[in-house]
């Protein structure tokens, strides 16, 4: 009972109960903090041959600055670790580009706020010969089709006191609500 939701939480609604989905995502993590926090290790203990591993990073990775950082440097290296580990388990890695933030230009077009990260993900998918789900482009089309005002219904935009303990208005243009997720 909270305003935030992710596609990893909602994806279960699109499968029968014969499919088991384990969502290891945690808000605020980057590819390297996911690995550094041993979440990949934990995930791998549950992974079986024939499983699918959907890998989406980029939102928080782009905040990392400094030597060796960037979409085509450390980020690509960490994403490749996910791919390699999944393959060692006999699983199928699938890359997912990050969803768009709700930031429009003056012409009502969604801005690109993820720098080179979506392109790096697409390039890795080609190089590794694995599928990519392009949520970057899908959410761009969705938000531009809905428009500036209507797209607020996808994100965490709520007046104060909509949720228990929420005393201030929420205007989050990065994170989805259950409808948007």
Where are the model-predicted features located?
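Serine-esterase "nucleophile elbow" of acetyl-processing enzymes
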Residues: 1-25, 41-49
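Short glycine-rich, polar/acidic loop-and-turn segments at beta strand-coil junctions
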Residues: 25-28, 59
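Short, structural beta-strand-to-alpha-helix junction motif
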Residues: 29-30, 177
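Structural motif
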Residues: 30-38
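Alpha-helical cap/lid subdomain in secreted, periplasmic
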Residues: 38-179
């Amino acid at each position: 009972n909270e305003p935030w939701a992710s596609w990893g939480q909602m994806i279960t609604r699109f499968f029968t109960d014969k499919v088991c989905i384990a969502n290891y995502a945690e808000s605020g993590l980057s590819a390297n903090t996911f690995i550094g926090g041993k979440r990949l290790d934990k995930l791998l203990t549950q992974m079986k041959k024939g499983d699918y591993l959907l890998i989406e990073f980029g939102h928080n990775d782009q905040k990392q600055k400094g030597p060796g950082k960037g979409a085509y440097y450390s980020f690509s290296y960490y994403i490749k670790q996910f791919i390699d580990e999944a393959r060692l388990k006999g699983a199928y890695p699938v890359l997912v580009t990050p969803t768009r933030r709700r930031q429009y230009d003056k012409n009502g077009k969604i801005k690109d706020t993820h720098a080179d990260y979506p392109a790096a993900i697409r390039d890795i998918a080609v190089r590794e010969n694995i599928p990519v789900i392009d949520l970057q482009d899908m959410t761009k089309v969705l938000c531009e089709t809905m428009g500036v005002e209507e797209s607020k219904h996808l994100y965490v935009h709520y007046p104060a006191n909509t949720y228990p303990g929420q005393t201030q208005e929420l205007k989050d243009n990065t994170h989805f609500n259950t409808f948007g997720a």
